[in-house]
Amino acid sequence: VKVNLVAIPGITSVAVHTGIIAYVEGRKDCWGILDAPLGKTPSAVLDYKTTANLASPYCELVYPWLYATDPIGVGKNPMKLLPPSGYIAGITARIDNSRGVWKAPAGTEAVLLGTIKLEYEVNDAEQDILNPNMINCIRSIPGYGICSWGARSLTKGDYTYKPVRRTNTYIINS
């Protein structure tokens, strides 16, 4: 089985994040999806990224966590708080299959199915700080639902954008 997306949902330690970065950079043929730590404000997530020195053209950091329906908890706890990386891997695969790796898995086309609400509602001003600092936000977009709203890698330069790095990787491996 060829693996091109790597995530360890819900594990947000610096050691694991730097391990994923080392792994995907060593392979150079896959993409890492890192979950921001649970329960953090936008400024705390930015501090985490900066302090942990998370940087890679082969990875992204996604924020915030999301609530989804929980069929097992119906009646008692109908929602479950989940890390975003699994959803981002899913929307990435869906857009890869429908449009290609060159299309950013973000925007109103990137609705995260089964989600109900966000752990934290990122506003426009917060998005304007997080996005250029290479933190991909998930937003609730009126009329569409909860959407992936960023597609940046954890680096600036030629490979700032996820689809640029992934398209380059796709061409090299074809």
What are these model-derived regions, one by one?
Residues 1-174:
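A glycine- and small-residue-enriched flexible loop/hinge signal that marks low-structured segments
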